[in-house]
Amino acid sequence: MLGYACMNHTLRDREPPLRCNRDMRKATFEERGVAYASELALQNFEDLHAILAWNAANDVGFYRCSSTLVPWNSQFDLAALPDYEAIRAVAERCGALVEREGMRLTFHPDYWCRLGSDSADTRATSVDAVDYHADWLDLMGLARSPYYGINVHIGATYGDEAATAERFRDAVADLSPGARARLTVENDDTESLWSVPELVDALDGTDVPVLFDYHHHTFTDRGLTYREAFDRAAATWGAVRPAAHYSEPARLHGADARPQAHAEVPADVPAWLRARADVMIEAGGKEQAVFAVRDATTAP
């Protein structure tokens, strides 16, 4: 199946717009507190259900939800929210819809989530972030499996790849059971960072799958073809169907952009990748990119 991340342009442009990423600045949280966070979280879950229903009606089976689904969740327990019971009821409807329609729902915490950081404070904050993403999936009643993944990057080597890998593994051990069971790690888009084979070696013995990012592999190929790298990553998923990311460089489509920048709409997704993985299309066109790829694939 094919999917897109976070924003749905079709629904965002409606009145009122549908979106599940309502957030607030720190100053607003300090002023309005948990009550306002609860209000936003309830709205986000309600709109997540509407987005998932739209996806199902439009045969889009894969969706990455925003990491601001519950704003400022690092500052409170989910069950402490004033609207917790209402949020839980909507979350359960979201999970039931996902399961009924055979859909796949994942998360991708922000760039600052660094489980292998050389800062103990950053590692602790990152563990907390992955844990509360898992709490949201638990609230929806979705299985503790990388099928409903929480995807991260190791993101740096801090001058010592082996020590970073060890810190990452230690942080994985500190995760809650629900977070640890859903964690996935993807290859990076900078030559000096983490490639697929390096991740496979670093994660050996952790049961954490490696998620293959097609475009990122361009920058960290380590002499492997795209298929060879995917095979190495796919072997870490066990019985679970792998997830993968696909994007095309904006430069390929005529944009004056850095090599890592994504095109608004890719031309296509390789047939072999679609056959062997659920593919998240990372593109500014969001759901429209999925439709374009699907139309290109089915055209005579």
Question: What do the predicted segments below correspond to?
Answer:
Residues 112-114, 156-160, 190-192, 218-219, ...:
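Short, small-residue-enriched loops and turns at beta-alpha junctions
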Residues 198-222:
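Long, repeat-rich segments with strong aromatic
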Residues 151, 182-189, 211-214, 282:
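Catalytic beta/alpha-barrel core
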Residues 1-104, 113-142, 146, 174, ...:
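Alpha/beta catalytic barrel-like cores
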